[in-house]
Amino acid sequence: MELLDRVGLKDKADQYPGRCSGGQQQRVAIARSLSLDPMVMLFDEPTSALDPEVGAEILAVMRELADDGMTMMVVTHEMGFAKKIADSVVFLHKGRVHESGTPDAIFSAPQTQELKDFLSALHQAGRL
């Protein structure tokens, strides 16, 4: 019950996950993972299929995990989120690592043209 409360779903304790919304299912998955007391949690595009409001809820849960010291490896296009919570960022393009470093280095002084183009597109779209 404590873990469901931690992800904001204490009121859903008697429901099957399949009866929950997509965002709620994501949070149930996080609670299930936390029940194993992991050293590291892996996330693969945790907000990609969610509307922005629900995606923000997932990011808030992940931010709390980071604040509590959870090590996470996150594959994401949510660059604003990565910039705020990451200790290190790895930029991949077409299956190849193009750059890695601190968020400040990656976002303030990109070295490769691919990363420069990616960040420029995000800025133009208002997503960073």
Where are these regions (language model features)?
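Conserved signature/switch motifs of ABC ATPase nucleotide-binding domains
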Residues: 15-18, 36, 68
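Catalytic Walker B motif of ABC-type/P-loop ATPase nucleotide-binding domains
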Residues: 41-44
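Helix N-cap at the start of a conserved alpha-helix in ABC-type nucleotide-binding domains
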Residues: 52-54
